[in-house]
């Protein structure tokens, strides 16, 4: 889409933050209005993360206006809210390509812009990185400032509090901005609070505060009285005691949509020494009524008509694997009150909305706390309950030690329902589920299953739920099933694959939902096709039988080749001294960028044509 200068005259003046800082302060509200409208127009045409960015327009403008970016370091947590940041930092005309193949990255990305200090996508990393940036700048005496922006969801994670605890100890010159959009701006975030924030962040108050501490440092009773008086004054209007106890100077909460007020407060805070904390209140979806009313639905959107405010409905076709999981969860919980379902802030994405409403006493959203989710599940298992941890593949990485130390070593019967395994698509490198088979396969006593369709997914969830000798994992992709008939639930024999087609010379050992592509290739090559189903334990007897009956084996998976299911097949053959050629097909040894799932699979040779071509090239 071409940029309409007449429609956005103030925004047209801002091709960089240097130009932004040349604008008169009085023009900033108009800039914010145009930026918000441009964001709405762009994302509705291209798709992307939406509501979060609408809520951070004023904050983004104020930060770049006050701080000398990119020299000063601005770090965004997660990055859903960073679209306005991209627009103001030289990427305005490319914003329509975001999350598309070859387009702008969905999150701040170091390789894309000097303004993107930290590549992000996962939650709660900003403060830790910000401390490092601040310490590095101090050691080099560069007078460079560091600012982190973190949301009210991300700040609940343990990593954020670990970082703040460290900051309180070493006291770097760092500003943490809490973007609190959990509720609309309420009465306690009004004129008094905004005035107090500017007063408490000002040089006069800061000088008196620090000077008083020095003068009375040797008089403990007076020092303590001053401390309590300050806390009392702040405590009348602010909820910052926790952050003060962690060693931060807390300011807020203030109106995050008052750009002029934010500029004044940030200017006051810019030169303060030590860890600073600014708490702003924003409205997710601000300025677009449908998104304000339903920020969860409008968090990430497909292309839609923003004049109607109606998102396109799904085609009503095949159910997603997430829905298959959610339906299985409800079906099983209706029969077994011992089932306990756990999610780290992924209720909607994991298909658990209906379950959370029907079985609220058996549902636990632990927030962005993957480590806690896994060890919490371990405790439930110790208490003779049956925990099911619903988690995205990419986020399970954050709880790897807990899977090993708190679950697997103790052989606790915890079921991991691993969604978004394999190619995820538009969210790019940080969200592809490329590694779970590799890092789970090496854990002793772990059962790892890869369904080839939605019916097999249900059967595997049932199998894992009723397995009592240790943890089980069922990994399934983002997207819809194949239309398979859903059969009555029954446990599968552990570690047994199924021959789907008998052929000659070549055997294709498929792990997961690429089975339809593998079937098309097997038909063309007259190859044997096997649905292996289990990555661990592998069907050793079947692998050895196939090796004895065929000239070559091909393994197929949507996981990293290194350490994946195919590597397991190689290990079996080497251990039994079977000298049969094996071609491992899967994800290559680099981080997979964004695109649609179909585009990425075609690029990687994981569609039927690509798989066939890889086999032909290998045999040539």
From Swiss-Prot:
Give the Gene Ontology MF terms in alphabetical order. Answer: 1-deoxy-D-xylulose-5-phosphate synthase activity; magnesium ion binding; thiamine pyrophosphate binding
Stored Pfam families: DXP_synthase_N, Transket_pyr, Transketolase_C
Q: Which residues bind thiamine diphosphate?
A: 80, 121-123, 153-154, 181, 288, 370
Key word Acetylation present:
no
* Cellular-component GO terms for this entry: cytosol
Q: Which reaction does it catalyse?
A: D-glyceraldehyde 3-phosphate + pyruvate + H(+) = 1-deoxy-D-xylulose 5-phosphate + CO2
Q: Which residues bind Mg(2+)?
A: 152, 181
Cite the entry's keywords alphabetically.
Answer: Isoprene biosynthesis, Magnesium, Metal-binding, Thiamine biosynthesis, Thiamine pyrophosphate, Transferase
Which cofactors does the annotated protein need, by name?
Mg(2+); thiamine diphosphate
The record ties this protein, via SUPFAM superfamilies, to: Thiamin diphosphate-binding fold (THDP-binding) (SSF52518), TK C-terminal domain-like (SSF52922)
Q: In which pathway does it act?
A: Metabolic intermediate biosynthesis; 1-deoxy-D-xylulose 5-phosphate biosynthesis; 1-deoxy-D-xylulose 5-phosphate from D-glyceraldehyde 3-phosphate and pyruvate: step 1/1
Query: What is one process in the GO biological process aspect for this record?
Result: terpenoid biosynthetic process
Cofactor comment text = Binds 1 Mg(2+) ion per subunit.
Which top-level enzyme class is recorded in the Swiss-Prot or TrEMBL entry?
Answer: transferase
Q: Summarize the subunit comment.
A: Homodimer.
* Similarity section: Belongs to the transketolase family. DXPS subfamily.
Official protein name in the record: 1-deoxy-D-xylulose-5-phosphate synthase
Q: Which organism is it from?
A: Klebsiella pneumoniae (strain 342)
Q: Which gene encodes it?
A: dxs
């Amino acid at each position: 889409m071409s940029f309409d200068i007449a429609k956005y005259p103030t925004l047209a003046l801002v091709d960089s933050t240097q130009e932004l800082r040349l604008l008169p302060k009085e023009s900033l509200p108009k800039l914010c209005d145009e930026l918000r409208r441009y964001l709405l127009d762009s994302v509705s045409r291209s798709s992307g993360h939406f509501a979060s960015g609408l809520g951070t327009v004023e904050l983004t403008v104020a930060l770049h206006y006050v701080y000398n970016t990119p020299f000063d370091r601005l770090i965004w947590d997660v990055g859903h809210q960073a679209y306005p940041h991209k627009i103001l930092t030289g990427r305005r005309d490319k914003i329509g390509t975001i999350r598309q193949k070859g387009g702008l990255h969905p999150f701040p990305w170091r390789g894309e812009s000097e303004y993107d200090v930290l590549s992000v996508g996962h939650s709660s990393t900003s403060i830790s990185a910000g401390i490092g940036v601040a310490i590095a700048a101090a050691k080099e005496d560069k007078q460079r400032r560091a600012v982190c922006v973190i949301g009210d969801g991300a700040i609940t994670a343990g990593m954020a509090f670990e970082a703040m605890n460290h900051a309180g100890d070493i006291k770097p010159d760092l500003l943490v901005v809490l973007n609190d959009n959990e509720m609309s701006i309420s009465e306690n975030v009004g004129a008094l609070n905004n005035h107090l924030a500017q007063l408490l962040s000002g040089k006069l108050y800061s000088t008196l505060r620090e000077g008083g501490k020095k003068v009375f440092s040797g008089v403990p009773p007076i020092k303590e009285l001053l401390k309590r008086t300050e806390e009392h004054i702040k405590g009348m209007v602010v909820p910052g005691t926790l952050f003060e106890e962690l060693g931060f100077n807390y300011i807020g909460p203030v109106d995050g949509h008052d750009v002029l007020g934010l500029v004044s407060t940030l200017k006051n805070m810019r030169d303060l020494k030590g860890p600073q904390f600014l708490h702003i209140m924003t409205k997710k979806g601000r300025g677009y009524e449908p998104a304000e009313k339903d920020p969860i639905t409008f968090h990430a959107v497909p292309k839609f008509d923003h004049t109607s405010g109606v998102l396109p409905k799904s085609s009503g076709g095949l159910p997603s694997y997430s829905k298959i999981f959610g339906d299985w969860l409800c079906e099983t919980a209706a029969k077994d009150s011992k089932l306990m379902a756990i999610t780290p802030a992924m209720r909607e994405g994991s298909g658990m909305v209906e379950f959370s409403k029907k079985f609220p006493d058996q549902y636990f959203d632990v927030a962005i706390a993957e480590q806690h989710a896994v060890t919490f599940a371990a405790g439930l298992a110790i208490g003779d309950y049956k925990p099911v941890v619903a988690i995205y593949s990419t986020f399970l990485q954050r709880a790897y030690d807990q899977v090993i130390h708190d679950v697997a070593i103790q052989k606790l019967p915890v079921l991991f329902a691993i969604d978004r395994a394999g190619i995820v698509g538009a969210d790019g490198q940080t969200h592809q589920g490329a590694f779970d088979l590799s890092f789970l396969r090496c854990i002793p006593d772990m059962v790892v299953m890869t369904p080839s369709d939605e019916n097999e997914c249900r059967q595997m969830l049932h199998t894992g739920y009723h397995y009592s000798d240790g943890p089980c994992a069922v990994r399934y992709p983002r997207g819809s099933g194949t239309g398979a008939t859903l059969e009555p639930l029954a446990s599968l024999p552990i570690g047994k694959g199924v021959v789907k087609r008998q052929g000659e010379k070549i055997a294709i050992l498929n792990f997961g939902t690429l089975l339809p592509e593998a079937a098309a290739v097997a038909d063309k090559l007259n190859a044997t096709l096997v649905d292996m189903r289990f990555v661990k334990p592998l069907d050793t007897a079947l692998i050895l039988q196939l090796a004895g009956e065929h000239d070559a084996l091909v393994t197929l998976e949507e996981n990293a080749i290194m350490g994946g299911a195919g590597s397991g097949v190689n290990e079996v053959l080497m251990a039994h001294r079977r000298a049969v050629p094996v071609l491992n097909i899967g994800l290559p040894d680099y981080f997979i960028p964004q695109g649609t799932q179909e585009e990425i699979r075609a690029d990687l040779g994981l569609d039927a044509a690509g798989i066939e071509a890889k086999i032909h090239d290998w045999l040539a």
